[in-house]
Swiss-Prot record:
Modified residues (Phosphoserine): 9
Source species: Bos taurus (Bovine)
The encoding gene: CAPZA2
Protein role: F-actin-capping proteins bind in a Ca(2+)-independent manner to the fast growing ends of actin filaments (barbed end) thereby blocking the exchange of subunits at these ends. Unlike other capping proteins (such as gelsolin and severin), these proteins do not sever actin filaments.
Swiss-Prot/TrEMBL GO biological process terms: actin cytoskeleton organization; barbed-end actin filament capping
InterPro entries, A to Z: CapZ_alpha (IPR002189), CapZ_alpha/beta (IPR037282), CapZ_alpha/beta_2 (IPR042276), CapZ_alpha_1 (IPR042489), F-actin_cap_asu_CS (IPR017865)
Domain of life: Eukaryota
Name of this chain's protein: F-actin-capping protein subunit alpha-2
């Protein structure tokens, strides 16, 4: 191990550390960071060399953050990245600084939005917030209105997580939806992602995603928002149902074919009792 450590350059060590951090399961960033910190044993090197990994993790995970003085959380995403560590809260029309390591928002300031698309963005946000409140107990959504390649574009992001470290599992749902505002009809493009980590007496991860495409009729802002939510709800319901059914099937067939739930005797072995019997027998023989 010492020989291998001597062969690795600082650049290579940081590259490996960054990979660990970027692939940290949801809700386990701090644990992975602390482990990597111990392995690297160089805080300055880790902070300077792996800073991009901290940022990439938060962007990929749609990390929610609360801004002091404002009621609703906002998501950290690439669509709200203003550069130089600043991000956009489109609902409150503010920019703020975000510390990717501490996951803290500071220095909120007024920020002018894309006025030409703001009425569309607001309509979609209102409809999406109602949908998220109904379907996601811990859900957060952020809706952006941007001009991309000359086209007015709506981007809607949803994040919901459950972190149950005491029960040895953590999970996160993310979905991203886009459509351009064009006459008559437009195409909605979405991607749905689920990541769950279960680590009691083992280490199992579910990482799944699905791409979605559908047509959306564009009329006025409010009606278009309603039709958009119908597409989102149908696709996300179908995806969640498919995931649940698939894993129920695997539990009933594949997993059972791989391993018996009970030994051939149909009785679970109490290893603690066996150990105590063995110790007692050895003491008698002594």
């Amino acid at each position: 191990m010492a020989d291998l450590e001597e062969q690795l350059s600082d650049e290579e060590k940081v590259r490996i550390a960054a990979k660990f951090i970027i692939h940290a399961p949801p809700g386990e960033f701090n644990e992975v960071f602390n482990d990597v910190r111990l392995l690297l044993n160089n805080d300055n090197l880790l902070r300077e060399g792996a800073a991009h990994a901290f940022a990439q993790y938060n962007l990929d995970q749609f990390t929610p953050v609360k801004i002091e003085g404002y009621e609703d959380q906002v998501l950290i995403t690439e669509h709200g990245d203003l550069g130089n560590g600043k991000f956009l809260d489109p609902k409150n029309r503010i920019s703020f600084k975000f510390d990717h390591l501490r996951k803290e928002a500071t220095d909120p300031r007024p920020y002018e939005a894309e006025n030409a698309i703001e009425s569309w963005r607001t309509s979609v946000e209102t409809a999406l917030r109602a949908y998220v409140k109904e379907h996601y107990p811990n859900g957060v959504c952020t809706v952006y209105g941007k001009k991309i390649d000359g086209q007015q574009t709506i981007i809607a992001c949803i994040e919901s997580h459950q972190f149950q470290a005491k029960n040895f599992w953590n999970g996160r749902w993310r979905s991203e939806w886009k459509f351009t505002i064009t006459p008559s009809t437009t195409q909605v493009v979405g991607i749905l992602k689920i990541q769950v980590h279960y680590y009691e007496d083992g280490n199992v991860q579910l990482v799944s995603h699905k791409d979605i495409q559908d047509s959306l009729t564009v009329s006025n802002e409010v009606q278009t928002a309603k039709e958009f939510i119908k597409i989102v709800e149908a696709a996300e319901n179908e995806y969640q149902t498919a995931i649940s059914e698939n894993y129920q099937t695997m539990s009933d067939t594949t997993f059972k074919a791989l391993r018996r739930q009970l030994p051939v005797t149909r009785t679970k072995i109490d290893w603690n009792k066996i150990l105590s019997y063995k110790i007692g027998k050895e003491m008698q023989n002594a």
